């Protein structure tokens, strides 16, 4: 464990030097000592001596101790020159000087290249399964135990466990022994905390923010201010850097001597039984510390640490008890993060809308290539920021992105290709953000996207093919996103999408073929989503589609035959959804369709030619669903079909001959519906068919029709026979 406390001898040196150089800052004095050392002058260098003895290397070109930070970088103005930046944490002063490369090389040689005094131990959870080993990933605190990938423990799990210990232990301090070995940690680890970090991010607590790693101390100081004003002595937070997670613990300690100490401890799951702690008697001193001051990795992890931690932004998400949730409201409103892809990714992930809105305005001034990179905002595992925002349910973030891009200030700033790349926000498997939102049943996110899409399409002049591709939300090997909605019976989500279509048709000029394709929602193999909805008895899905058709017809020319094709679309097995609904007895689906017949007649001019396919529901072998219902003893289905014909025959213009044609319709096996019922011994269904025919003959006045008389006599004669196997 590393503890940073003031050293009296070092403070004395600084004070003595400051007294002899009243008009120079300590940063300037430090630089003067470096120059003197480089030139070979035999002069005292107390600042350099103390720094060399107490500093550690935080990056390839970064050194620091409790008072100073030295950074080396390439000069922005002179590519052949180097720059040295000296930051004095106590005075809050910064000095930058252009130097020759040989000067940098000399200083790099005299400063310690790494800290060998730290007690570091890699987290190394070994497999108990000897027969099959899986690779362990040391970086990012990720390992497999007991040897299977599905049992992996990643850094966010360990960081969350550490926070639990902070609040659960009596002294608000985790017992480091619990983290000292793989065995002890696994004994201590609570598997319930595996989803805790994700839940914390999704809950969007007050005080969350994204800051430059160099401004980490500023955020800690802001938290200490709120803690003091609310009388709270301990709090914890999760730190997210790229896809790595750490834990920070803040503590205000009042000593018996009347002093107040402000303590910041950072625990990194990359190492065990170790944390770095900085203590100060002044909150103002805390704000000078960077996250790099708390990093404790050995040389083998140094490059990873530089690339993915200390040189990036950090998301800080307070983890407070429920009664303290509002304590940090407004505490970090003044924190301005750097404009970088890492920042944008974290802002979208944690739902920090205030900071994101400010950066979206700044993006308009950047070149398109950089602007696209910022808005796509991939992290190191190729997940775009917008995808993460959708994953965590940050509807306001999604709305900010889409609405900002819809403003005239962005018109012409992005090519259509780059814009679609940003909006689709695909993961590494090619699934878009819209696909994710609909799959997660996140109505708020989907509504935000669909509401903003018409204006965005108008601003950037997107054509109907681009909008259609966005709405279909599929990759080259996936099903249409609405296929999953219909198959799973998510009527509310389907209604949200269909309600947005009329405006999209009007503004984006979607064609009838594109709209009907969205409604059919086929999977990769061509099976329609509506087929599965009917097969599974999801009548709400059928109802939502039927209710949406009239409003869609006002925008595009949908015909009666189009609707019949939609309702009778076939699966790979060449059955229709209505065929399967009749076979399985899904009365709710059948009633929903037949109850909509008057509306279909009035709106789409349905006639008897359109009605008959719905009554019979043939499969590709011309075998009717009505006959399949008879075969499977679905008496209610048979009764409903004949009742629908009886109720609507006059409306649809059926004549006596049409009715008799329906009654005498034969399957490929040459049976009529009555004969099939009789053949299978379903006498009740056979009598139902006969009685319905008699009622319709009386109602329509064709009791003297020769076809009717002959059919009636034939059916009555069959019913009087003892054996069913006597059909003609």
Swiss-Prot record:
Keywords: ANK repeat, Repeat
Taxonomic superkingdom: Bacteria
ANK repeat start-end pairs: 381-410, 429-458, 477-506, 525-554, 573-602
Annotated family: Belongs to the Toxin_15 family.
Protein name: Ankyrin repeat protein A
